[in-house]
């Protein structure tokens, strides 16, 4: 699994498709190449202290490790934003939510339409 590390990559993924799920939000963006899928993980301080945030990130990384080979598409960047519910949700449910979020993300248009001004 390749990781996103640069801020620019995270910001670029934020312009793509968002697929909310129980415990996290999945952001997906097509890069336009055939390289393997890349994943990034982020959890804000709203979720809790460092121990809780790291626990959420570990759970999200494990979900991706177990499922991304099958469901993720090459040439895409994915960012998982952890939410507080990820601390208490059963792991099996989070795995199902991840699979559903990937399906929803790939079923939507890959670019957002431009916002028209009202002038």
Model feature map: region roles:
Residues 1-119:
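Positively charged, solvent-exposed patches that mediate nucleic-acid binding
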């Amino acid at each position: 699994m390749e990781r996103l590390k640069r801020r620019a990559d995270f910001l670029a993924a934020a312009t793509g498709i968002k697929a909310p799920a129980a415990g996290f939000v999945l952001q997906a963006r097509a890069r336009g190449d055939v390289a393997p899928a890349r994943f990034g993980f982020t959890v804000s301080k709203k979720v809790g202290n460092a121990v809780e945030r790291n626990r959420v990130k570990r759970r999200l990384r494990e979900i991706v490790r177990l499922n991304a080979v099958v469901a993720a598409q090459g040439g895409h960047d994915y960012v998982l934003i952890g939410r507080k519910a990820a601390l208490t949700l059963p792991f099996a449910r989070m795995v199902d939510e991840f699979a559903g979020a990937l399906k929803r993300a790939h079923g939507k248009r890959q670019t957002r339409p431009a916002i028209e001004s009202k002038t």
